[in-house]
């Protein structure tokens, strides 16, 4: 069930689902696995916010175990393509494609909450069928692995050889370790409270 937010306006009350209300504040939330549906939704929201105001930053909050590499690249490429800077924030877990998208934010604007976890690894896949079909799938996975590792190297500043070694198995990081690694730029603590 998606929570509904009721807002008072000059013309009465107006109800929004929580995600629509967050979108009005230029906040996009990825709180699930990266699939074709979730990626299309995120891409559409990013494009909408760019059309609404190409100068104003967008915030992408990520709590995702990962998912489809192809669909994740769709989100990644859109983040790179649009004019507004995208702040990425890990809330909970950014694993696999979730970590890749966390790293996709504008330099200096990639963050994590203090108790979140970040995990990178190589793409997963399964193939069945004839030997030639299995080879085609294996070649594609190796291609995607190289592409992901190259992008991670470019975004983090880590040598490609280190990325390849670290992604060979699940590689978990705390937010401070992710800063050292170059995946994020800072850890968000409590927002300052303004006193009137």
UniProtKB/Swiss-Prot annotation:
The keyword rRNA-binding does not apply. Keywords: Cytoplasm, Hydrolase, Protease, Serine protease. GO terms for biological process: protein quality control for misfolded or incompletely synthesized proteins. It is found in: Cytoplasm. GO terms for cellular component: cytoplasm; endopeptidase Clp complex. Disulfide bonds: none annotated. InterPro entries: ClpP, ClpP/crotonase-like_dom_sf, ClpP/TepA, ClpP_Ser_AS. The keyword Cytoplasm applies. Gene3D superfamilies: 2-enoyl-CoA Hydratase, Chain A, domain 1 (3.90.226.10). GO terms for molecular function: ATP-dependent peptidase activity; ATPase binding; serine-type endopeptidase activity. It comes from the Bacteria. It catalyses: Hydrolysis of proteins to small peptides in the presence of ATP and magnesium. alpha-casein is the usual test substrate. In the absence of ATP, only oligopeptides shorter than five residues are hydrolyzed (such as succinyl-Leu-Tyr-|-NHMec, and Leu-Tyr-Leu-|-Tyr-Trp, in which cleavage of the -Tyr-|-Leu- and -Tyr-|-Trp bonds also occurs). Its EC number is 3.4.21.92. Signal peptide: none annotated. The active site is at residues 96, 121. Belongs to the peptidase S14 family. Cleaves peptides in various proteins in a process that requires ATP hydrolysis. Has a chymotrypsin-like activity. Plays a major role in the degradation of misfolded proteins. NCBIfam families: clpP, PRK00277.1, PRK12551.1, PRK12553.1. HAMAP family: ClpP. Fourteen ClpP subunits assemble into 2 heptameric rings which stack back to back to give a disk-like structure with a central cavity, resembling the structure of eukaryotic proteasomes. This is ATP-dependent Clp protease proteolytic subunit 1.
């Amino acid at each position: 069930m998606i929570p509904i937010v009721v807002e008072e306006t000059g013309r009465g009350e107006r109800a929004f689902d929580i995600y629509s209300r967050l979108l009005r504040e230029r906040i996009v939330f990825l709180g699930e696995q990266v699939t074709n549906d979730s990626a299309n939704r995120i891409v559409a929201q990013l494009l909408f916010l760019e059309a609404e105001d190409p100068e104003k930053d967008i915030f992408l909050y990520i709590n995702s175990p990962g998912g489809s590499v192809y669909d994740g690249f769709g989100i990644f490429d859109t983040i790179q393509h649009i004019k507004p800077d995208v702040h990425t924030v890990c809330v909970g877990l950014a694993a696999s494609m979730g970590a890749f998208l966390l790293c996709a934010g504008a330099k200096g604007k990639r963050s994590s909450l203090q108790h979140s976890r970040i995990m990178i690894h190589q793409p997963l896949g399964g193939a069945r069928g004839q030997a030639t079909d299995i080879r085609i799938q294996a070649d594609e996975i190796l291609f995607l692995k190289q592409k992901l590792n190259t992008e991670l190297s470019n975004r983090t500043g880590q040598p490609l050889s280190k990325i390849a070694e670290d992604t060979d198995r699940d590689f978990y990081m705390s937010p401070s370790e992710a800063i050292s690694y170059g995946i994020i730029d800072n850890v968000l603590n409590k927002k300052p409270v303004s006193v009137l």
